[in-house]
């Protein structure tokens, strides 16, 4: 067949085994095996390129076949399979190249458009900053002396900070961590525990909570089911805090929040549907703890967290929602990034993008990381490489644009609504107090100290030594779980193929803990089996140790053993985000050989204690190991360098830099907390009518409050207003109203009249009606059925109602009155897709509704304002241009219902409008942060603040007014607006009304990046369904059932 000659030639070589290659030309592997075999050569080349274990199995079966004809047929079939695999890989490479080209063009276009708004005052100073890159990056001085540290401590002692860290997956506990037990319980677990412990010991920090998942499964230790665990401080920071100053709730704690299946330990890829449940549980803990701390250290004022720090994508997603719900700053550490993993998997060519998404939930993970970038004040990375080669893959971060925006902010110049998180490199810390490197080696006895004159060898030493026939040889140590990305098999190949290295050294592989290979995960067992086969293949018995078990307390002793033998630590991972084990090894006096991809580059730059290698080149790995093992002078120099510079990676150093970054970031907290009802304590209690009359005078005229454009229209008629500045007046007037409203805000004081609180605070149950669609299409009939289902409890007032919708308040008012409803039928109105919040007045003498004057300050974080609006208008015009010059405007601004925090647009043809993910991507590339929602059967689009939504509005009601989320029952249709998924999950009850949706609503979700099952678990006991027809009795029945769950 044409184009297949290369397959035929290989096939002929395999079937007709000829003389071997010259020794000088053949690889060391082939020379050691003896006679050259094209069969083996061909298969090895394919395995090297594709890592396809199935091909190797096919080859083994073909070799075992006795019949020549059958053998040849199998070999031929194998070659055709390889050819197909090669074609698939080529196709994936072409698709990847096209994707990269498209992204590069999008990025360049986004930069141009973002710069266009800022071009009129772009200065040479900004250009200099862009050119010099990091030269302007302020660098905090490192603490290199005890005096400097003591000075810093004295400055911090008066502070009493509350910090929240989040790390969801894996098994987390303070002592005897089971690192390596599975792929989720690795370096991140150790890092977050030690970070929490270190921060809890810092002056100025009162309490640190590390939030994680509570696991009450019989498959794991009981300790993971304990709600709270205090982290005992280490005596390693040198701080002399007086114990008398420590309060009742001070210190560092692991707090385990129950969410997801109560009796199962599940992998991180399966946690995504349960994130909303965690957020609600965490929100409850933080609010309650903030109140407790307020009583202890805040003079009765709530002490909110100074920051919420999410670790990895799942915790980042959670931290973003918590940050929005509480209005406090968020920090992010990615640890391992989804886009980078996707790139690596696509390069391997073994899986399609759909397969990758199904296996790793990669698109859900990437969107969580993008949202985390939207919400984060600071992104903490371990290395510059993580910023330059990994974070730059994301729509929400552009290093070039970030430098421009930072320069403008320093000069006090407008950024036109654009925001970019600050990337900060803070290497992880380590405890060094208990590390005492041995001075002796295995060739001579170590000098006995006075403190330990006859100290016995640790048991783990004997466990390792039993593998070796010559245990005194230098030990090459690798400590990593059996994961393909850790590249352990290449290390074993390098060791096995290099005879001089085998003669000089032993190899120790600490690959986590295991009982039986069959009990391991398929991936881990596959790696371990490959290692065992390679040991057998190269006959490495007596030269390689691979113990089955070790404790976390044994790890320092393993490092000491390797250093005692004058060995080398190696990390051959394809990519290492940081490389904490490299720092641990250096602290124990071990030189290193490490991958040149990732964090080890920065570690080597600081410590200068080893060599970097290409992890794909096994020859270079073998050469580097041999060089360090054979050259004792080089070994000694690397050891001394590592020990001399290791203090730069201490936990006090890390924590000081960490806290300094938080202090320099923009601080925010709930609006009512800062104002805290000034002056109320010195005033006489107001009567209900007086308290509401002040608010009425300012805002209870609905036509003025919600539709200030009428005022502008009047001014235009009088010739006093131009079109150019009308929008600016609207925004400033709206802000002025809300500032005035703050003077008449609801009081938090319990001794005030009950009428100052929204009515829903008195309810035993709250029905939230969030059914989407067209209000003229019978949706109000459903509202009546829900009212009827509440029955006498509605009349008695034990059940309250909240209407949650994409419509504006004037539209809702018109619809309600036209359908015979009263505005007092609902206690609250969540309008404009969650960007507006109103309450029913409790005094019949007053007007109907009251705006929550604190809500806008709660959701305005990173709101682009007029700069965002202008960009959206340009985007709308570009949609029309793409459809032809004669085409009518596809999408137009709806000024009638737009507000200061919701830009509304009319869509005339939804088939010509791209999905929401494309618009959000375009805005992110231009550093504009927003939440885009297609609503009202696709006829409207609302653009609101990035952390605002209808589900977040419910969390606000809990934080602001103490309304328990578990008391809420949210009613939704079978489908809804594009924010529909956020309403389903959480601790509240959800009732899905089957049949309440239409084709238009379903089409809004047709272009999702991931299925609904990656967002919410419809099997949750908090979710129930009512069959098509939705009778009042059925609704009442399902609510009763859910309440008992």
UniProtKB/Swiss-Prot annotation:
CDD domains: GT4_sucrose_synthase, HAD_SPS. It catalyses: beta-D-fructose 6-phosphate + UDP-alpha-D-glucose = sucrose 6(F)-phosphate + UDP + H(+). Keywords: Glycosyltransferase, Transferase. Residues 664-674 have a biased composition (Low complexity). InterPro entries: Glyco_trans_1, SPP-like_dom, SPS, SPS_C, SPS_pln, Sucrose_synth_GT-B1. It is an enzyme of class 2 (transferase). Activity is regulated by phosphorylation and moderated by concentration of metabolites and light. One of its GO terms (biological process) is sucrose biosynthetic process. This is Probable sucrose-phosphate synthase.
